């Protein structure tokens, strides 16, 4: 079983724990997830099975979309409702101020990784240092918040929908919004609605998998490797070239000119497919596609990033 299964994660388990359970239930040899969800969080968690685990490095780069609820007036050491409370303040806010705060944290913003997170320092996740009482301050990172839409105010709770780049911590965003509002805040609910092109509409629950009911229906939900990178341009190649690439060949301009090449800029990613739709490789173009005709003969036109042995 090679492919991607979109899971609607339940609260209470780590993403890695979910992966281990899916491996056991489905009997797959390898599995991995793209985009960690905290135990508190629910929603879209792409699970990559067997050969599809090679796609994790690409799927993890995708933008995300969430629905979050924050509790105003309460600050915790973990920035979510499960952590030890460190401060309480009365939230004296209105809709205008809340909308202003959401707008303030839209666009490129700077975030420090939470002390209780899976980000590694000296090979160990930050939460392991924090539990030992060691406070590690990592440099801030710039992330992108594309939109923050207010959905509901039921003080002290505020619910909003946010679309953002990879690496954005919604816990940190809630805490920063609380400080902007002058009362502090922590995240109380988080649901991921989208990860790249994957949404809840195609998701299954762990309970669906564990029940074993409708196994054929479940297997029909497994997304082929070639569909895992839907936003990446595709080039269909011959079986002969597929074999050469899988043996380590880096195609040059003269080789690629034999095929239909979509419009690509220098640095764009591309996926090579067989005529039957099997994923051969993911590569990065070293020239714009309109420069292939004048590229150095015999010099690679792409850099192969990952090779796949897709049985499609």
From Swiss-Prot:
The keyword Isomerase applies. It catalyses: uridine(55) in tRNA = pseudouridine(55) in tRNA. It is an enzyme of class 5 (isomerase). InterPro entries: PsdUridine_synth_cat_dom_sf (IPR020103), PsdUridine_synth_N (IPR002501), tRNA_psdUridine_synth_TruB (IPR014780), TruB_C (IPR032819). It comes from the Bacteria. Transmembrane segments: none annotated. The keyword tRNA processing applies. Its EC number is 5.4.99.25. Keywords: Isomerase, tRNA processing. One of its GO terms (molecular function) is tRNA pseudouridine(55) synthase activity. The active site is at residue 38. One of its GO terms (biological process) is tRNA pseudouridine synthesis. Belongs to the pseudouridine synthase TruB family. Type 1 subfamily. Responsible for synthesis of pseudouridine from uracil-55 in the psi GC loop of transfer RNAs. This is tRNA pseudouridine synthase B. It comes from Syntrophus aciditrophicus (strain SB). The lineage of its organism: Bacteria, Pseudomonadati, Thermodesulfobacteriota, Syntrophia, Syntrophales.
